[in-house]
Regions:
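N-terminal Rossmann-like NAD(P)+-binding domain of SDR-like oxidoreductases, especially those catalyzing
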Residues: 1-188, 318-322, 328-342
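C-terminal substrate-binding subdomain of Rossmann-fold SDR/epimerase-dehydratase oxidoreductases
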Residues: 4, 17, 30, 58, ...
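Amphipathic alpha-helical recognition patches that constitute DNA-binding helices
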Residues: 12, 156, 190, 197, ...
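Conserved strand-to-helix beginnings and helix N-cap segments that scaffold or border functional pockets
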Residues: 42, 67, 89, 195-196, ...
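A glycine/serine/threonine-rich, flexible loop-to-helix segment
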Residues: 48, 132, 195-203
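Glutamine-centric residue-chemistry signal
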Residues: 78, 193, 202, 219-220
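The catalytic Tyr-centered alpha-helix of NAD(P)H-dependent dehydrogenases
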Residues: 150, 154-161, 191, 195-199, ...
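Hydrophobic alpha-helix immediately C-terminal to the catalytic Tyr-X-X-X-Lys motif of short-chain
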Residues: 164, 168, 172, 202, ...
Length: 342
């Protein structure tokens, strides 16, 4: 595999994957296809060698452009997505366009040229789970984590659009022989994440002298994974995964939002209660938890960032050291949240 396309490669998770490939696979040339919406940033690719990484500014819904690029590549890794739940509740239309129509455009081109395709998705397609304390197996029993066999039950316009794209990929594999795999990952954290998201929002609030905000009671649980571990898992699936299979990516990082925020405040030298509780998101999923045993057992993948505290400290340090990357957008992001009382 000498040439790959990474859609959304100037965004958070996509750009981290590009860095991972450049740092670990010197034989691979990466073409980044990114629309550079508010969540895409050329600066995320700064410092990468020009002979290894090419940025094409364009829309994955542009069938002519996609066709031109796909016919010259060995594989497409599809990260590009509208992904912020709060935005999907205000205006679902970009989520339908990018996440469904864009994915369709890509798989059609990959089908036409018989190009390997990997579809990056989310655990949110499965809906949510009860809290561990309310389950007979305390979160470890049968059906108490998401598996590749879990029934889809999306609860937001965002997760519904991702579920739709997953199902298109499955249908194209079965109907047309598309050379595809799917991964559904838990919540990512790490460098280059847009400051509208939970962890970077709170870090940059503290750095800006703004009190952090917690939705509702903060008991909602997310299964956190460092984005570097997500990148290594996607590479393992791309190169070793079985065509037509779905792999779940997780690092056993379950934490509720309140605990994450209090740990973040502690690591930043602030009182653990120095935050404001604000109104909850409508339809806020209660708990996500990933069973990644298939990925680990079949492909031999293991996460490296198994200590959430050290991973969070690493992330805090990155935002502290890179204020120029996020500072210009901070006021607008907080003003947007303030309109919703959040």
């Amino acid at each position: 595999m000498k040439n790959i396309i990474v859609t959304g490669g100037a965004g958070f998770i996509g750009s981290n994957f590009v860095h991972y490939v450049v740092n670990n696979h010197p034989e691979v040339h990466v073409t980044v296809l990114d629309k550079l919406t508010y969540a895409g940033n050329r600066a995320n690719l700064a410092g990468l060698p020009a002979d290894r990484v090419e940025l094409v500014v364009g829309d994955i819904c542009d069938a002519e452009l996609v066709d031109k690029l796909v016919q010259k590549t060995d594989a497409v890794v599809h990260y590009a997505a509208e992904s912020h739940n709060d935005n999907s509740l205000k205006d679902p239309s970009p989520f339908i366009q990018t996440n469904i129509i864009g994915s369709y455009t890509l798989i059609e081109a990959c089908r036409k040229y018989n190009v390997r395709y990997h579809h990056v998705s989310t655990d949110e397609v499965y809906g949510d789970l009860p809290l561990r304390e309310d389950l007979p197996g305390h979160g470890e029993g049968a059906g108490e984590k998401f598996t590749p066999e879990t029934r889809y039950n999306p609860s937001s316009p965002y997760s519904s659009s991702k579920a739709s794209s997953d199902l298109l990929v499955r249908a194209w594999v079965r109907s047309f022989g598309l050379q595809a795999t799917i991964s559904n990952c838990s919540n990512n954290y790490g460098p280059y994440q847009h400051i509208e998201k939970f962890i970077p929002r709170q870090i940059t609030n503290v750095l800006s002298g703004i009190r952090p905000k917690l939705y509702g009671s903060g008991q909602n649980v997310r299964d956190w994974i460092h984005t570097n571990d997500h990148s290594s898992a996607v590479w393992a699936i791309l190169t070793k995964g079985k065509i037509g299979e779905t792999y779940l990516i997780g690092a056993d990082g379950e934490q509720n939002n309140k605990d994450v925020l209090e740990l973040l405040l502690e690591l930043m030298g602030q009182p653990k209660d120095a935050y404001d509780q604000v109104k909850d998101r409508p339809g806020h999923d209660l708990r996500y938890a990933i069973d990644s045993s298939k990925l680990r057992e079949e492909l031999g993948w293991q996460p490296e960032f198994t200590d959430f505290k050290s991973g969070l400290q690493h992330t805090i340090d990155w935002y502290r050291d890179n204020e120029d990357w996020w500072q210009a957008e901070k006021a607008a992001v907080e003003a947007n949240y303030a309109k919703n009382g959040q």
